[in-house]
């Protein structure tokens, strides 16, 4: 009997373009394969053991004869390709009415709302990665004290202010108010408060990031687990991506290794329910991304050795982020899924699954909660024999 599920979602863990990726300009996206090619191969022995080499050909990764985990890949049926859409679908909510708000930048009407609430003129309003926005607008920001604003070209806008110019609490509150005002105006968008530190030309993200998001438009696995009396713990930005709904408690740590440490620590404190962690392992430079991914792989045995008989571990992603492509933005890709447990089957090919909502259905079935409206559980495939 499964008593506890550990769900690790790696931000940007793509493994090849989805059939509709061309509509998003992502038909060439293949995050992990291109990363491996760029750095001369990846050393991921623990993901390799779980079955990574069976999901896709990756330089440096072998296809094991007897994988220790079950493996497959997940597609996404929702429109969009950002973290909100990805995590909502992983939780059992497919969004088909999503309108891309910031395809050409943040619209003027939205900018008027944002600048009214911030109380200052902003600079930027470009489609960019964080590193690019901070590099290009950092010197002007330090000189003018104007907040930097940018978008992912989808449905997220980021607001960055140096810690010496606005307190983290003030920045978070203003972004919370922006999200509410835009929601009241009928705009569904994620607003990210990102404090920064450093000197002109070398600004970098600091602690205190918060993501302000509307609640999911449907029933999630968190809702039904909460309703059934299960404990639901959020680590990283998981809590923010659901506007807190359905979580018992959250720990807003954004360093991937700190988040992983939090999960390890909870194994001794949380006896049942769901531990849901987000891990950002794809910084915007190829060598740093490969280093982060390999460091995560080396830490997996620390998790596995602490598992109990009734534990189930699921490792997957929320979208791709092919750093070899221009822009270094989220990409429309399949994500791998790996499942392991001390007492369940090994080496089962879970196949190519149409929707990431299958993860949610598996989690609620494993923890004996009510069935969700969408998704097919793969729990039966995990049973030994």
Residue ranges of model-derived segments:
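Feature captures the catalytic ectodomains and active-site-proximal regions of enzymes
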Residues: 1-385
